[in-house]
């Protein structure tokens, strides 16, 4: 456990936050706020930082790559490459990537099921021809024995 002494946190807006002394086991910066007041008596920030009067919230834009454009088309977000704007929100890219990931998983599930049926059909055909792993192994070992016997005869001559 750590003792956190009375700490001061300076915010960028010209205010100071005091935190009460307390015992904190993991996160020493967390704690109840005790008081907030301006940093200087004049009310201006001594560091010279002035906050902007008006803050505009513009969503972040992202320029999609060729691969991202293909994903946007494949997931049905846009009908053609020409319809895709030059800048798109990152959330749109993330959503389309997740949809593409799910579609790819469904395709892999389908291919796995098709492969299982293909293995079943080929196994039934092998049974009709009386082929099995045991018969293949016995034939291979018999061939090895014949080769070993021929090699022993050629050595003795």
Swiss-Prot record:
InterPro entries: DUF1075. The chain crosses the membrane at residues 104-123. It is a single-pass membrane protein. It comes from the Eukaryota. GO terms for cellular component: membrane. It is found in: Membrane. Pfam families: DUF1075. This is Protein FAM162B. Belongs to the UPF0389 family. PANTHER family: GROWTH AND TRANSFORMATION-DEPENDENT PROTEIN, PROTEIN FAM162B. Keywords: Membrane, Transmembrane, Transmembrane helix.
